Amino acid sequence: MLDIQQIQAIIPHRYPFLLVDRILEIEEGKRAVGIKNVSANESFFVGHFPEYPVMPGVLIVEALAQVGAVAMLKKEENRGRLAFFTGIDNCRFKKQVKPGDQLRLEVEIIRAKGPIGKGKGVATVDGELVCETEIMFALGDKKND
């Protein structure tokens, strides 16, 4: 299990864009399971939607990508690198995510060759499917250019 400080030591995301609160399970380079506690105070609820707050679907996908990044960047040979989001396939949203929900975010790396890979992501709330997608990524080094 990884807490928020340990997650921040692995991926560079910070508030308001860090969308993972805890990693519950991890197999380095293979899979990870994380959670995001969706608070009524999330900044995106100000405009999405003021009278009917719903977590934007793209942020659910981003949360899945961050969990996948933790799985890949926890591997010794990838430490200190960045995981760049390069594509989405077969993305479907099945249920709305609202304040008070806890998102369970599961990502399995289904292909990794060199710095390029693909993960299968599934997000649920209370055991009900919210989103499923395939996420493509590329690992890169930090540059000061």
Curated annotation (Swiss-Prot):
GO biological process: fatty acid biosynthetic process; lipid A biosynthetic process
Keyword Amino-acid biosynthesis: no
Single annotated GO MF: (3R)-hydroxyacyl-[acyl-carrier-protein] dehydratase activity
Keywords assigned: Cytoplasm, Lipid A biosynthesis, Lipid biosynthesis, Lipid metabolism, Lyase
The reaction(s) this protein catalyses: a (3R)-hydroxyacyl-[ACP] = a (2E)-enoyl-[ACP] + H2O
Protein task: Involved in unsaturated fatty acids biosynthesis. Catalyzes the dehydration of short chain beta-hydroxyacyl-ACPs and long chain saturated and unsaturated beta-hydroxyacyl-ACPs.
Descriptive protein name: 3-hydroxyacyl-[acyl-carrier-protein] dehydratase FabZ
EC number, UniProt record: 4.2.1.59
Annotated SUPFAM superfamilies: Thioesterase/thiol ester dehydrase-isomerase
Enzyme class of the recorded protein, top EC level: lyase
GO cellular component: a single term: cytoplasm
A Pfam family of this chain: FabA
Organism: Geobacillus sp. (strain WCH70)
Active site, per annotation: H48
Entry's family note: Belongs to the thioester dehydratase family. FabZ subfamily.
Annotated InterPro entries: FabA_FabZ (IPR013114), FabZ (IPR010084), HotDog_dom_sf (IPR029069)
Subcellular location: Cytoplasm
Keyword Isomerase: no
